Amino acid sequence: MTDKTSLSYKDAGVDIDAGNALVGRIKGVVKKTRRPEVMGGLGGFGALCALPQKYREPVLVSGTDGVGTKLRLAMDLKRHDTIGIDLVAMCVNDLVVQGAEPLFFLDYYATGKLDVDTASAVISGIAEGCLQSGCSLVGGETAEMPGMYHGEDYDVAGFCVGVVEKSEIIDGSKVSDGDVLIALGSSGPHSNGYSLVRKILEVSGCDPQTTELDGKPLADHLLAPTRIYVKSVLELIEKVDVHAIAHLTGGGFWENIPRVLPDNTQAVIDESSWQWPEVFNWLQTAGNVERHEMYRTFNCGVGMIIALPAPEVDKALALLNANGENAWKIGIIKASDSEQRVVIE
């Protein structure tokens, strides 16, 4: 016989019962995202999904992403209900720029100590993002790892798979001199530049919960969920000849627009075509951030830029604005052998 205390997994910091409670809590919201192609439900070792029958030569498109240090701001302000939307948006917006329809999404949620309420809020946000983009939340991993994260801090990552007809892949190869650039307005900084945002808050001594901007707390502007453009863009692609789409994420204008430009072309952006949302003016002023750095770090009010032939512009703008987007002509494509792929003037 021994008088040693019997240890359990819970004694080591892993609460399986909490994990099971979380699964029970989220089943309903996850079920709402289900597409007809998905087979089975939550709890299997793997998720099964058939390809939609309308595709003749389907090509799968995949992407994975996180939300960067926007997550730190959300944790500090104890606002967990929209960070899941951000996570989905960062993945599905990357897929749709290639013409792909998102099919299914998986998430990874890791924490030192699982708080069921917090995790449920995050995953409910993920389900909402999936509803907005028309994809199914088919599974995920909730990892409780004591000693790896401080307290109830957590991290999230997402993985998405979509499908596009092989002949309809959008890769920028059709972009040519004279194409027009259309902008889609952003909902705020989206999920990029938050290390600089947090540094500006620190240096300025500003409390985002008590500082007001345009009649609401600065925190509301900074934590506004990333806009999901999937449904609007998919309809646009069906009805308009789209040559390229750039998702303005990390690297801003300078790095993301060139990713979809063929050689010997240059994007010329008309800075007078829009006004920065007030949150970007605040960030620039409070942080004394140079203009070039603003365009490299933030989207400055532009979430996506679409290149298309000039005759298609009016139709595209009408369709996008009818679908609730804030869309406008932001520039043109010029033939150029300059090393400067993007000009903002």
Curated annotation (Swiss-Prot):
Main location: cytoplasm
Family under the similarity heading: Belongs to the AIR synthase family.
Gene name of the record: purM
Species the sequence originates in: Shigella flexneri
GO cellular component: cytosol
Top enzyme category: ligase
Catalysis performed (reactions): 2-formamido-N(1)-(5-O-phospho-beta-D-ribosyl)acetamidine + ATP = 5-amino-1-(5-phospho-beta-D-ribosyl)imidazole + ADP + phosphate + H(+)
Keyword Cytoplasm annotated: yes
Localisation: Cytoplasm
Subunit description: Homodimer.
Metabolic or biological pathway: Purine metabolism; IMP biosynthesis via de novo pathway; 5-amino-1-(5-phospho-D-ribosyl)imidazole from N(2)-formyl-N(1)-(5-phospho-D-ribosyl)glycinamide: step 2/2
Segments forming a coiled coil: none
InterPro entries on file: PurM-like_C_dom, PurM-like_C_sf, PurM-like_N, PurM-like_N_sf, PurM_cligase
GO annotation terms (biological process): 'de novo' IMP biosynthetic process; adenine biosynthetic process
Enzyme Commission number(s) from the entry: 6.3.3.1
Name assigned to this protein: Phosphoribosylformylglycinamidine cyclo-ligase
Keywords on record: ATP-binding, Cytoplasm, Ligase, Nucleotide-binding, Purine biosynthesis
A molecular-function term among this protein's GO annotations: ATP binding
